[in-house]
Amino acid sequence: MRTFAPWILSLLGASAVASAADATAEAPSDVVSLTGDTFETFVKEHDLVLAEFFAPWCGHCKALAPKYEQAATELKEKNIPLVKVDCTEEEALCRDQGVEGYPTLKIFRGLDAVKPYQGARQTEAIVSYMVKQSLPAVSPVTPENLEEIKTMDKIVVIGYIASDDQTANDIFTTFAESQRDNYLFAATSDASIAKAEGVKQPSIVLYKDFDEKKATYDGEIEQDALLSWVKTASTPLVGELGPETYSGYITAGIPLAYIFAETKEEREQFTEEFKFIAEKHKGSINIVTIDAKLYGAHAGNLNLDPSKFPAFAIQDPEKNAKYPYDQSKEVKAKDIGKFIQDVLDDKVEPSIKSEAIPETQEGPVTVVVAHSYKDLVLDNEKDVLLEFYAPWCGHCKALAPKYEELASLYKDIPEVTIAKIDATANDVPDSITGFPTIKLFAAGAKDSPVEYEGSRTVEDLANFVKENGKHKVDALEVDPKKEQESGDATETRAASDETETPAATSDDKSEHDEL
């Protein structure tokens, strides 16, 4: 199961929050402020719009503000407007747009073609992403615009395919459409341009502003092969990890090796020293440097001591495995090279972070830790409802008394376990995208847990267990009093939920503390 810890993104962006928190809103702005009265008209009048739905008190919104502003200025000359909507003032508009957290960024091509912005929240990333959105999936290349197109983005993929090769053209176009959010694509059928670039038709060339500057693919034009090649060719031999690059690395499908260093000089030195190792293992593992002064806390998530640098660790998101390198040893390329090879050869046991297994279970909710996860969650014939929580999570704290009440319903029902695990203190083999996350591991189907997305009330959670569990236990029927009380809970739910989100929906089903 592929999984990673998305809350790391908050660590990678945390340093920006404080510096941006006091940014003034009085200066002239290229970001257009819209209201319920102006939003629809503005969107209809523009072919492409990026909209931010925010709240003034939101820390992540404050951190984004200067980057969003700068991106708006850079995109203004390209006629790509960036707008913002204050959801504390425009609740109805935000509710209509399905806003469930802050900030929410959405791309509009008119009112009926809306999709979420899925790039990084950095100026360069926003500009790059929106420029790609403004272009066709595949831009035409001519002798006159070739050099311009090659440098339009950090990564540009150009297909040199003859016009009569319909199969290759169709596959390349389909591939470009599927990846247009990630890369800028162009193509030409002009054989003279291909010859000038030193390639034969059909070939795909990836131009980049780092390493060897370009890479050529002359294999079979096939979707999966192209995707694998583009991902590998577009990744620096030794990159720099930050908020704008984290997601790409962690979803690449191969292990990620981290080199933590506190100074720019150290990171540059490690980059040069590790290039030959990165070249040797290209396509099998990615290697990055990371600023330990800004993001050193992430070392703790890799089971390293976050106070001792330089440091090295490998993370395999596909297996949710972590391999910290012995911090008593110096980080030397030769030794690390052997360590990497041993990890790839499965000769190194992964490190598992776990709290101590409780000597006794106190209270109705079963406490799970990494070392008891297999026994309590997976290796049994029970329906197990498991909450993944974080101690600092406000929504988790609000859920706690209701979750305990839920667990009390099942205290005499051996077929069902209501459990929780601190996902910040234990390595968990599941994909967690927010806190709290609640999953039901049904007996006989432990490898395909069902995530709960409903309202967090006792009766709704109990019904979820009944409907999705193997044993179909109806705890409310066992406790008729609870069933009688469910009507009162339903009546009060809407009122309490209005304080949870900007869009006052009927429940709090999508509420997570932002990660």
Swiss-Prot record:
It catalyses: Catalyzes the rearrangement of -S-S- bonds in proteins. The record marks 456 as: Lowers pKa of C-terminal Cys of second active site. The record marks 121 as: Lowers pKa of C-terminal Cys of first active site. The keyword Disulfide bond applies. Belongs to the protein disulfide isomerase family. Participates in the folding of proteins containing disulfide bonds, may be involved in glycosylation, prolyl hydroxylation and triglyceride transfer. This is Protein disulfide-isomerase. It comes from Aspergillus oryzae (strain ATCC 42149 / RIB 40). The gene is pdiA.
